[in-house]
């Protein structure tokens, strides 16, 4: 940790995009720090969580106390599982949206990770001075590492080596069911069951668990204990030699050893087991003399296996900051130089070839990408201190058609910060909040469709449509909107098409179809029995069915080709929103595919196109090229003379 003194070398190594906010948020306290450069962590402050209504309030208080200007990037390690955008703390009353918090604080980047995932990322960099070995064993290089730590809860994580980097495991292993190893622990379990229907290891070997053990032993000895006795009091009494407190600490450490052994054999942690958290360091010599290590190795046939695995107590000050700093640095590195963010790599490569004015726009895009995405051109020009035409020239220098095209590519490069899980809209959300959630949910669904769509099925569907004699689009209810949109696009290809949203008309028309005809059935549920019966009639007559629906539905299983668009809607009872967008996107993909096939006709279609040209006075290929240009909003390449 830096002392805060600035040397010339330190100044030279400062982050170009300004100081980064680091946070370690536990169930009791929130710790904050600023990282001014790699390894330069300063202004560490601790705030009691109970004094602030929200996490945002605590961060604002810290930024005010630290007297820091704008912070662009922040990362938070939190004592809670992190799955998606919404975080609701288990051991505290804070609940927040990551994206809403980022917007409220004006950050370009806000990462939130499990605190033990962050702590795990700090382990490879710990020196011998920052850890103390307990017992024997020798760690094996480039092997799995386990991490655990009792604090307000019982954190668990692990590190897996992968080439030249480490992958941290997010885990809630502390909630595994507690299994007693002796009669004393049986007594503790029975006592804890009076209060908790499920007794996890966290209940008995996190900080509050020591109080449960102490009271269970007191009840055994028929001793009365004051209601206000807590873990800190028990540890203090143990250090003073109190027999009951000493036994409680001994039992606590033994249970912790059992859990550590479980973690070691589960992960195959030949790189060692590390102990963090705030409780064990306060035990001092009591822990060193405890049965922790003996219980760790007590695994019967696997005793020799565990005897070779070392266990360490982390003694580094604020180690979670080191880990969360590494995670944030990797995220920002991927953005500016990783293969997954080509637009940022392109800006970096082109920067030296740009004019000085264009470089200022490039720097704004690299350091404040969301400002480029969200602001109108007048604000972008003002922030970069350039003219509006310079902004456009910069975009075109990167090969973009204009600012809108550049914004789209930039947003794609930022997908790592777009929540890839569903965010619920709640009563009381502002227009900013629920509007952002609707947009984020839609973007997330489209990105996931891109990752999971079966493009072999897409190719098959395009082949079927391109060779169809007639195409009919069926959609009931809200899906009829998609069917009508598809009809509007496909009829321009010169293929007879029609859309039906009425079940009676669908049944009447399907009875007339046969070989060479195609039905595109659009359905969110894929379970309407009437629609399935209509499709059966058409397929028995030789027609083919392309289904745009969810996976593993009766419609998907029955269709000739299924294009599956799985997603999450906010509520099943309301009109489909995300599914409609995904279905429209699928229609666009199919239409573009057919347009490409028809704009570059093969020899077998030449005669048919010649006849079409004679009748219509224009080439069918030219017509398809026009449709392709229309579908791509003018972005399709111009045909050569």
Curated annotation (Swiss-Prot):
Documented EC number(s): 2.7.1.2
Ranges where the record places region Glucokinase: 1-340
One Gene Ontology cellular component annotation held by this UniProt entry: membrane
UniProt-annotated stretches for the region Putative HTH-type transcriptional regulator: 341-641
MF GO annotations: ATP binding; D-glucose binding; DNA binding; DNA-binding transcription factor activity; glucokinase activity
Domain SIS: 461-600
Annotated positions binding ATP: 23-28
Location in or out of the cell: Membrane
DNA-binding stretch(es), residue numbering of this chain: 377-396
UniProt entry keywords in alphabetical sequence: ATP-binding, DNA-binding, Glycolysis, Kinase, Membrane, Multifunctional enzyme, Nucleotide-binding, Transcription, Transcription regulation, Transferase, Transmembrane, Transmembrane helix
GO biological process, one term: glycolytic process
UniProt superkingdom: Bacteria
Topology with respect to the bilayer: Single-pass membrane protein
Catalyses which reaction(s): D-glucose + ATP = D-glucose 6-phosphate + ADP + H(+)
Residues of the HTH rpiR-type domain: 341-417
Signal sequence annotation: none
Transmembrane segments: 576-596
InterPro entries, sorted: ATPase_NBD, Bacterial_glucokinase, Glucokinase, Homeodomain-like_sf, HTH_RpiR, RpiR-like_SIS, SIS_dom, SIS_dom_sf
Family per similarity comment: In the N-terminal section; belongs to the bacterial glucokinase family.
HAMAP family the record matches: Glucokinase (MF_00524)
Protein name: Bifunctional protein glk
């Amino acid at each position: 940790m830096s002392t805060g003194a600035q040397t010339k070398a330190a100044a030279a190594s400062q982050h170009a995009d300004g100081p980064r906010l680091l946070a370690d948020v536990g169930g009791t306290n929130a710790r904050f720090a600023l990282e001014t450069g790699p390894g330069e962590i300063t202004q560490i402050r601790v705030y009691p969580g109970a004094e602030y209504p929200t996490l945002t309030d605590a961060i604002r208080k810290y930024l005010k106390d630290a007297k820091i200007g704008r912070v662009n990037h922040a990362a938070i390690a939190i004592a809670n599982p992190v799955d998606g955008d919404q975080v609701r703390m288990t051991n505290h009353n804070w609940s927040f949206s990551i994206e809403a918090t980022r917007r409220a604080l004006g950050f370009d980047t806000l990462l939130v990770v499990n605190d033990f995932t962050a702590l795990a990322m700090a382990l490879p960099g710990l020196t011998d001075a920052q850890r103390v070995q307990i017992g024997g064993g020798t760690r094996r290089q480039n092997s799995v590492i386990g991490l655990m730590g009792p604090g307000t809860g019982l954190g668990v994580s692990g590190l897996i080596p992968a080439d030249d980097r480490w992958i941290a495991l997010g885990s809630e292993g502390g909630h595994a069911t507690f299994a007693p190893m002796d009669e004393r622990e049986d007594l503790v379990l029975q006592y804890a069951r009076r209060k908790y229907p499920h007794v996890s290891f966290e209940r008995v070997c996190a900080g509050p668990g020591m109080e449960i053990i102490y009271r269970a032993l007191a009840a055994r000895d028929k001793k009365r204990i004051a209601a206000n006795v807590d873990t800190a009091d028990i540890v203090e009494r143990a250090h003073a030699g109190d027999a009951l407190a000493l036994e409680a600490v001994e039992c606590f450490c033994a249970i912790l050893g059992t859990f550590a052994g479980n973690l070691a054999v589960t992960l195959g942690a030949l790189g060692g087991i590390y102990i963090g958290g705030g409780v064990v360091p306060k035990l001092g010599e009591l822990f060193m003399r405890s049965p922790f290590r003996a219980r760790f190795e007590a695994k019967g046939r696997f005793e020799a296996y565990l005897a070779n695995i070392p266990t360490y107590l982390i003694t580094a000050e604020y180690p979670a900051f080191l880990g969360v700093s590494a995670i944030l640095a990797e995220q920002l590195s991927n953005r500016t130089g990783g293969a997954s963010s080509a637009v940022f790599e392109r800006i970096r490569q082109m920067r030296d070839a740009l004019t000085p004015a264009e470089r200022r726009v490039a720097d704004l895009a690299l350091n404040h990408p969301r400002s480029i995405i969200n602001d109108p051109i007048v604000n972008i020009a003002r922030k970069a201190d350039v003219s509006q035409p310079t902004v456009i020239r910069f975009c075109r220098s990167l090969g973009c058609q204009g600012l809108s095209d550049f914004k789209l590519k930039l947003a794609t490069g930022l997908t790592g910060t777009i929540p890839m899980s569903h965010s619920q809209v709640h009563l009381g959300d502002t227009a900013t909040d629920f509007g952002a959630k609707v947009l984020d949910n839609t973007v997330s669904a489209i990105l996931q469709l891109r990752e999971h769509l079966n493009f072999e099925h897409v190719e098959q569907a395009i082949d079927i449509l391109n060779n169809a004699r007639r195409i009919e689009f069926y959609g009931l209810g809200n899906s009829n909107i998609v069917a009508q949109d598809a009809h509007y696009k496909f009829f321009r290809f010169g293929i007879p098409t029609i859309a039906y949203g009425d079940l009676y008309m669908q049944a009447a028309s399907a009875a007339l179809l046969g070989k060479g005809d195609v039905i595109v059935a659009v359905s969110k549920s894929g379970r309407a029995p009437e629609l399935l019966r209509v499709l059966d009639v058409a397929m028995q007559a030789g027609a083919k069915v392309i289904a745009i629906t969810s996976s593993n539905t009766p419609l998907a299983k029955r269709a000739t080709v299924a294009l599956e668009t799985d997603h999450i809607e906010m509520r099943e009872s309301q009109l489909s929103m995300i599914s409609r967008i995904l279905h429209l996107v699928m229609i666009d993909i199919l239409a573009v595919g057919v347009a490409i096939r028809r704009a570059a006709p093969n020899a077998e279609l030449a005669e048919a196109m010649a006849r079409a040209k004679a009748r219509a006075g224009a080439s069918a290929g030219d017509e398809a090229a026009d449709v392709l240009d229309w579908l791509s909003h003018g972005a399709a390449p111009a045909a050569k003379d």
